[in-house]
Curated annotation (Swiss-Prot):
BP GO annotations: defense response to bacterium; defense response to virus; innate immune response; integrin-mediated signaling pathway; ISG15-protein conjugation; modification-dependent protein catabolic process; negative regulation of protein ubiquitination; negative regulation of type I interferon-mediated signaling pathway
Subunit structure: Homodimer; disulfide-linked. Interacts with, and is conjugated to its targets by UBE1L (E1 enzyme) and UBE2E2 (E2 enzyme). Interacts with NEDD4. Interacts with PARP12; this interaction inhibits PINK1/Parkin-dependent mitophagy. (Microbial infection) Interacts with vaccinia virus protein E3.
Protein name: Ubiquitin-like protein ISG15
Post-translational modification: S-nitrosylation decreases its dimerization, thereby increasing the availability as well as the solubility of monomeric ISG15 for its conjugation to cellular proteins. Induced as an inactive, precursor protein that is cleaved by specific proteases to expose the C-terminal diglycine (LRLRGG) motif. This motif is essential not only for its conjugation to substrates but also for its recognition by the relevant processing proteases.
Lineage: Eukaryota, Metazoa, Chordata, Craniata, Vertebrata
Record location of the Glycyl lysine isopeptide (Gly-Lys) (interchain with K-? in acceptor proteins) cross-link: 157
Tissues where the protein occurs: Detected in lymphoid cells, striated and smooth muscle, several epithelia and neurons. Expressed in neutrophils, monocytes and lymphocytes. Enhanced expression seen in pancreatic adenocarcinoma, endometrial cancer, and bladder cancer, as compared to non-cancerous tissue. In bladder cancer, the increase in expression exhibits a striking positive correlation with more advanced stages of the disease.
Region (Involved in the ligation of specific target proteins): 153-157
Keyword Disulfide bond among UniProt keywords: yes
Gene: ISG15
Length: 165
């Protein structure tokens, strides 16, 4: 069954999102991203008025939300730079200052400049997952001193994980 949830921001503005009881916080955050353009990793949600933080991957109904409910949205600007490590194919790690709102493509440009390898000749992975150029770094849960791996593309038409050439 579908219902509307009120999302209230600290500045006082409110908006509605359509949900179902089986939806999780991750799905709610995706709806909020579509509505106001704030990435999911920047969203902190809490039940109004209790202030209890919502748990990711838990159905909204299990957290006491239903028709007529309101959640508070706090947006983390993620302005502070953080240092991460990028390990190249020779096993050497270099430190990079990044912001979580930067895209993977921006980090690849930085790595390309330092490593002397064109950015279309490598891809980056974190915790075994390939990083998508168009996504912000914050979508991957990077923390200070996280290690990202640089993977060189093989000559001769090899493909990277995900089937891209």
């Amino acid at each position: 069954m579908g219902w509307d949830l009120t999302v209230k921001m600290l500045a006082g503005n409110e908006f509605q999102v359509s949900l179902s009881s089986s939806m999780s916080v991750s799905e709610l955050k995706a709806q909020i991203t579509q509505k106001i353009g704030v990435h999911a990793f920047q969203q902190r949600l809490a039940v109004h008025p209790s202030g209890v933080a919502l748990q990711d991957r838990v159905p909204l109904a299990s957290q006491g939300l239903g028709p007529g409910s309101t959640v508070l949205l706090v947006v983390d600007k993620c302005d502070e730079p953080l240092s991460i490590l990028v390990r190249n194919n020779k096993g050497r790690s270099s430190t990079y200052e990044v912001r979580l709102t930067q895209t993977v493509a921006h980090l690849k440009q930085q790595v390309s400049g330092l490593e002397g390898v064109q950015d279309d000749l490598f891809w980056l992975t974190f915790e075994g997952k390939p990083l998508e150029d168009q996504l912000p770094l914050g979508e991957y849960g990077l923390k200070p001193l996280s290690t990202v791996f640089m993977n060189l593309r093989l000559r001769g038409g090899g493909t990277e994980p995900g089937g891209r050439s």
